[in-house]
Amino acid sequence: MSTIRVDVVSTEQSIFSVEAKFVALPGESGELGILRGHTPLITRIRPGSVRIEKADDDEEFVFVAGGYLEIQSDHVTVLADTAIRGHDLDEAKAIEAKKRAEEAMQNRGTDFDLALAQSEFAMAAAQLAAIARFRRKK
């Protein structure tokens, strides 16, 4: 099976680079599946788990906190606001962040405070979902 080059980068650093058979990630309008030869595309991505099926049939998971995706026929670049490899995700921190966001939503002050709390809640929930997905694949 032919492969596609996958680069996952955050605003701080390169997170992951590999030859892969398949990539799945949360696009703005739904889940995207990418194989070599995919139609070129640039789109936003939502917070969630990027699943990379490597050329050696091993899988790698990376949590992204949103960002952009560029697809070329032989290359995929994920430019994430924040990216964390699956094995580096901290469940306790995500649970605590979700709890703080829930409390902030209940004790909201301004509309801005509510929007920020909702955003933090969505991010923590996406991290917990990514952790659950990562555990199922172990």
UniProtKB/Swiss-Prot annotation:
GO terms for molecular function: ATP binding; proton-transporting ATP synthase activity, rotational mechanism. Belongs to the ATPase epsilon chain family. Produces ATP from ADP in the presence of a proton gradient across the membrane. Keywords: ATP synthesis, Cell inner membrane, Cell membrane, CF(1), Hydrogen ion transport, Ion transport, Membrane, Transport. Signal peptide: none annotated. The gene is atpC. Transmembrane segments: none annotated. It is a peripheral membrane protein. This is ATP synthase epsilon chain. The keyword DNA repair does not apply. It is found in: Cell inner membrane. F-type ATPases have 2 components, CF(1) - the catalytic core - and CF(0) - the membrane proton channel. CF(1) has five subunits: alpha(3), beta(3), gamma(1), delta(1), epsilon(1). CF(0) has three main subunits: a, b and c. One of its GO terms (cellular component) is plasma membrane.
